[in-house]
């Protein structure tokens, strides 16, 4: 795993993340970056296949760390800011397997599962960093057919291949609010990414 993608603040939070490793697994862009090493991480997304109580998480966390801000506390999601790092706890309704581990700290899905989750979420939140992740996955690791097949296994009838492909090539509503910091050797222009994603969408 490519732990160099973490910021100093994230490394300091790993013992806290480990406290919840029995119920939650690490997903999203941070988990993808740990597999690939392409960009700096900025947050932690922790998913559970079972429900949880946000207020109980709040109390447990405050015994070990100062919470700067509670951003979301509703059924199925608890998002906070600690040391400037956004940490999200989320109840995930789909059957994913946490087959990998970051040392003995936290479990994670394999890269193909993470790719399927990322592509499935693409149309729900158009952030440039998500397109960057998809680009590196399809460029160096899996074909679009691989990812679509995995998506069908996880999301069943909700998997829409035609929609996936169109979303990959549509950039009009993309948010660039969260800048992408590439790790050394992975630098690439936005235009090059857009060009390749359009090609992938047609492949």
PLM features per residue range, with description:
Residues 1-203:
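Compositionally biased terminal segments of proteins
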């Amino acid at each position: 795993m490519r732990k160099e993608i973490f910021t100093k603040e994230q490394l300091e939070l790993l013992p806290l993340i480990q406290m919840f490793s029995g119920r939650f697994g690490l997903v999203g862009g941070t988990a993808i970056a740990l597999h690939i090493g392409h960009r700096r991480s900025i947050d932690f997304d922790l998913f559970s296949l079972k429900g949880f109580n946000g207020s109980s998480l709040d109390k447990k966390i405050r015994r070990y760390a100062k919470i700067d801000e509670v951003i979301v506390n509703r059924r199925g999601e608890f998002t906070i800011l600690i040391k400037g790092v956004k940490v999200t706890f989320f109840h995930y309704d789909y059957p994913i397997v946490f087959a990998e581990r970051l040392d003995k700290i936290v479990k994670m899905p394999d890269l193909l599962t993470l790719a399927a989750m990322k592509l499935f979420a693409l149309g729900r939140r158009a952030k440039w960093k998500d397109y960057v992740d998809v680009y590196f996955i399809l460029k160096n690791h899996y074909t679009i057919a691989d990812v679509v097949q995995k998506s069908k296994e996880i999301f069943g009838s909700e998997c829409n291949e035609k929609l996936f492909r169109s979303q990959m090539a549509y950039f009009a509503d993309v948010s660039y609010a969260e800048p992408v910091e590439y790790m050394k050797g992975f630098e690439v222009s936005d235009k090059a990414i857009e060009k390749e994603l359009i090609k992938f969408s047609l492949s």
